[in-house]
Amino acid sequence: FDRYNQILDEHNMNLREAEQILRYLKVKSVKDEETKKIKQEEAEMKKKIEGEASRKKLELEQRRTEQQPSGDANDMFGSTDDLMNLDLDNFRTDFLDFGETSERPQNDDMMKDIFEMKTADNSEGSAMDSLTDLNLDFLDQPAQAGPEPAAPAQEDDAGLMPTDQMENLFSQFDELVNSGDY
């Protein structure tokens, strides 16, 4: 009977050891499945992120290729959307001739020659000759010590734009600033 109990005890011990091993393997398999699942999710997220990055890179390249034909304005100003939409129809007459009287400066023709580069023999010397022929008499005149005398009011208004054009420009400027599209 003692021997029988001893064999049963050994058998019980073996069963308990086997039971512990099975529990360990069960827990290990659950953990392995969880790690596999986490790794798969990480791999999917990585693929998704890489896919989005490559898609964004392609879109950026497409934008660059689309913007290259209009590169002249973009090179100078960055983006054509940022440029102000101004009415420049009368720019020459309104702004470049601002304050101009009937007299033209005597060196105006020489300046035109310089900018047009009228060189018959394609040499750079003739353009430099025009530069040395400029009227630089103002350099020989001494500076006035006192403040300049005030000009009559009639002369100040002679070169200004008409009041309605000024008001129009100011109203366009106010609209632009208040709209927030600047």
Swiss-Prot record:
Residues 32-66 have a biased composition (Basic and acidic residues). Keywords: Coiled coil, Cytoplasm, Cytoskeleton, Repeat. Residues 140-153 have a biased composition (Low complexity). Residues 32-81, 140-160 are annotated as: Disordered. It is found in: Cytoplasm, Cytoskeleton. Residues 1-68 form a coiled coil. GO terms for cellular component: cytoplasm; cytoskeleton. It comes from the Eukaryota. This is Tropomyosin-like protein. It comes from Pichia angusta (Yeast).
